[in-house]
């Protein structure tokens, strides 16, 4: 029927819920799971996971104890204790998303994080705000917070909090971090993403579970822009004062 789901050749399913118009095919192992409408699963492993509407999971992707929301596209790689908001994209084998919250996120090859500092155990977490992109082999040691639509390049060990600087490019070789505010706002990739997200909505329901707001200029983001501008203005004033006193 129009709203039926299809299950073909899966390996193991136990204690789960499968919504309407779901297709599950291939080497799938899943226990204690919820899979919502319009989702495609192929060759993946899920343990204690929620998968929202319109998601695509395949290529040997594995996840446990994670929430995966609408229109996420996950192939290869893995997620552990992760909150993967709408349009989270991870397409590479060596990618690990762990102990953090992500949304409208793009993980480059080899992107990973650590949510423990060995002696203390896995007690830390972090936040990549909407639209963050990670370059290949980027690494973040939690706790940390990255502002919306920023780009990470390198390895970050000093727990940055750049929430007040959206649209920034952050670079680090493991030591001090360099931040270039308001750079990605002019990148063609940012505007391309903004335009393509509504076109890649796989949900067919007229009343989908997730209410997605695609607007780029949202009040929360503009408030961060305002806070960042004030912080830079204060720093500029102090620098000018120190130079004038010399």
Predicted regions and their residues:
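Glycine-rich beta-solenoid repeat tracts in large extracellular/virion proteins
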Residues: 5-6, 23, 40, 246
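Long, structured ligand/cofactor-binding scaffold of large enzymes
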Residues: 9-10
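Glycine-rich hexapeptide-repeat left-handed beta-helix
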Residues: 1, 24-31, 36-233
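Single conserved hydrophobic/aromatic residue that forms the stacking wall/gate
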Residues: 239-246
